[in-house]
A protein has these predicted regions:
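Central helical "cap/lid" subdomain
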Residues: 47-52, 250-285
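Dinucleotide-binding Rossmann-like beta1-alpha1 core, especially the glycine-rich loop
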Residues: 58-183
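Redox-cofactor binding/interface segments in oxidoreductases and associated redox assembly factors
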Residues: 21, 63, 262-263
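Extreme N-terminal leader/targeting segments of oxidoreductases
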Residues: 1-18, 36-37
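Glycine-rich FAD pyrophosphate-binding loop
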Residues: 36-55
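Short phosphate-binding/catalytic loops that engage adenosine nucleotides
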Residues: 39-40, 176, 228, 277
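N-terminal Rossmann-like FAD-binding beta1-loop-alpha1 element of flavoenzymes
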Residues: 16-42
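Helical element adjacent to the flavin cofactor pocket in flavoenzyme catalytic cores
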Residues: 162-174, 196-259
Length: 285
């Protein structure tokens, strides 16, 4: 692992008691990195490591996935998506009043200037993805679970290819590596595809996890083996009575630590609301 050493004149990192709520890929990775820095870590997770969101997914490490959801094209397509019973967008109308603050921010962030800004910020975060996976897999001895052939995006029609030009320009403008492929080159990169695709672009710095479920089981086992504590209790709320500690209330009692990390996915919003913090977070599914 490449560890960040304190700069000259800075004090070493203080070792703390930390609670992590949520044991998905974000939570378990955070917990292991904290352990590696010498902190005492307690992880709260009620589900099995290889179930829930962490099961049945593609395991993609997509460094180039920095195009925001909020774009002018997304907003323009909302009416047709809602009217299509088989479309990718569905809204429970009874939930619409609660959803409006999030939707308002979505529309606001679809301005071209904000799309550029948000893409650059996402790119800055994702630039560390491959390196961080390499670090944590080295720490835990699970290095054989990654493969980096790049991410290939293919287009069957000229219309689809033309509509994607703004995405290509955005990726290039923010410094992502992109390779443009013609129909012959597509077949050389991916032999299993039928020769029906006319255009494609490849982002070579992307990869994927070969077995996401196996990875999650391995990370949880490594966390426990390295001295981490896992408690299978559901967290119901958060309290903070003083600046130096924070407590969480579970289905079985109260636990206190110096620091708290919330990585509970869509459930993070309700947990944070128990201490008056509101975040613009909604479930995608």
């Amino acid at each position: 692992m490449v560890k960040a050493e304190p700069a000259r004149g800075e004090e070493p990192i203080k070792k703390r008691n930390v609670i992590v709520v949520g044991g998905g890929i974000a939570g378990i990775s955070t917990a292991i990195f904290l352990l590696d820095d010498g902190h005492h870590v307690t992880l709260f997770e009620t589900g099995q490591p290889d179930k829930g969101t962490s099961s049945g997914n593609a395991g993609v490490i997509s460094v180039a996935s920095c195009v925001p959801t909020a774009t002018p094209r997304t907003i323009a397509n909302v009416p047709s998506m809602l009217l299509n019973p088989h479309g990718p967008l569905m809204i429970r109308w009874r939930y619409l009043p609660k959803l409006m603050p999030w939707l308002s921010r979505l529309v606001l962030n679809a301005k071209p200037s904000r799309v550029q800004r948000n893409a650059r910020r996402k790119a800055g975060l994702l630039a560390h993805a491959s390196r961080n996976y390499d670090q944590i897999l080295t720490i835990t001895g699970l290095g054989g679970l990654t493969h980096q052939p790049g991410l290939l995006t293919v287009f069957e029609t000229e219309r689809g290819w033309r509509q994607a030009q703004w995405i290509l320009k955005l990726l290039i403008d923010i410094g992502r590596e992109v390779e443009i492929l013609n129909s012959n080159e597509i077949g050389q990169v991916e032999h299993g595809l039928k020769p029906i695709f006319q255009h494609a672009f490849l982002t070579p710095d992307s990869g994927h996890i070969l077995d996401p479920g196996k990875l999650m089981i391995g990370l949880h086992e490594a966390f426990l083996a390295r001295g981490g504590v896992r408690i299978s209790e559901r967290i119901l709320g958060i309290t903070r009575s003083n600046p130096k500690s924070v407590s969480v209330t579970s289905s079985n009692g109260e636990y206190t630590a110096e620091r708290l990390v919330i990585t509970a996915g869509a459930w993070s919003k309700k947990l944070l609301e128990t201490i008056g913090i509101k975040v613009p977070l909604e479930a995608e599914r």
